Structure formats: C-alpha cells, structure tokens
C-alpha cells in the first residue's frame, strides 16, 4: 500500500498537481492511487485499493507526518521551526476508522520531509524511485511488506546527486 501511495504522489508531483510537501487527501490523489493499484496489483483477493491505510500508517516512517485538522491554526500562529518529527507527533486513528471522509475530517494533510520533496522535483530521481518501488515492492510480490522504506527514502538525496 505504501509503495502505491508513493507512486501516486510521484505521478502528481510530476504533473504539477502536488506542488508542496503538504499532501492533502484529495479526490485526485485517491483516483491516482486506485489507477496505480490497478496497474500493478490488479484485482486482489487479499487486498483492496484503500488509500487510507498507507496515508495513515506512513506516519511511522521518518519522512511522513500527519497534521491534524485542528493543528493547522496552532502551527500558523507558532514561529516557523525546522521540520522535525517526534514520536509525540504520531496521531491516533480517527473516529470512523479507515474511511476517506474520516481521514479528511481528522487530518488537514500529511507533511512530507522537505528534503524528500525536493528530491522528487528531480525528474531522474523520480524515475529511479519509481523503478525501485515497482521492482522491490510491486512486481510479483503482492504481499511483501516494506521494512526498508525509510532507508530507501533517506538514500534518495544520494540518488539525486548521481542523477
């Protein structure tokens, strides 16, 4: 699920739909997630193309932070501080559980690490990340989990330098 969400985000960054590291759970992102899912996973008897699970659970990765709907005003009032993530930043599953409506009500957006987002601005880095995500997590491995996703994301600045 996380690889599919990242591929959808990469596509929307490339098409200039996503222009900043604040990733909202928009209809366009949901649609793109489903398109990517169908392309690589097809119809699965085990999994369904549910964007809410990776959108929520990616907060356990060091590059993804959920921002609560009520946190936005406090963040705007506070002084600008560097992007950082603490365990205290982890959010609880919203009332209504895993539904797009519940996620939208609970979270204003997910914030991607600025460094990672900057890397995604590079066409070659996007292409390389796509290949890695597809080959490692989506090709003939429908049930493989992503234990090394954080390491992969932290290596992206090096990939961008090579590209």
Segments the model singles out, each with a brief description of its role:
Residues 1-162:
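Mixed-charge, low-complexity interaction segments
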């Amino acid at each position: 699920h996380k690889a599919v969400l990242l591929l959808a985000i990469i596509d929307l960054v490339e098409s200039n739909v996503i222009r900043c590291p604040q990733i909202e759970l928009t209809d366009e992102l949901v649609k793109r997630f489903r398109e990517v899912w169908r392309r690589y996973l097809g119809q699965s008897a085990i999994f369904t193309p549910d964007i809410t699970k990776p959108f929520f659970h990616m907060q356990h990765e060091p590059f993804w932070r959920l921002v609560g709907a009520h946190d936005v005003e406090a963040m705007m009032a506070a002084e600008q501080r560097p992007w950082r993530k603490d365990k205290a930043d982890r959010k609880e599953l919203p009332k209504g559980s895993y539904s797009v409506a519940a996620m939208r009500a609970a979270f204003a957006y997910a914030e991607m690490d600025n460094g990672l987002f900057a890397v995604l601005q590079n066409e070659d880095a996007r292409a390389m990340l796509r290949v890695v995500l597809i080959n490692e997590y989506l090709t003939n491995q429908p049930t493989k989990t992503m234990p090394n996703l954080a390491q992969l994301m932290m290596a992206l600045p090096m990939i961008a330098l090579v590209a």
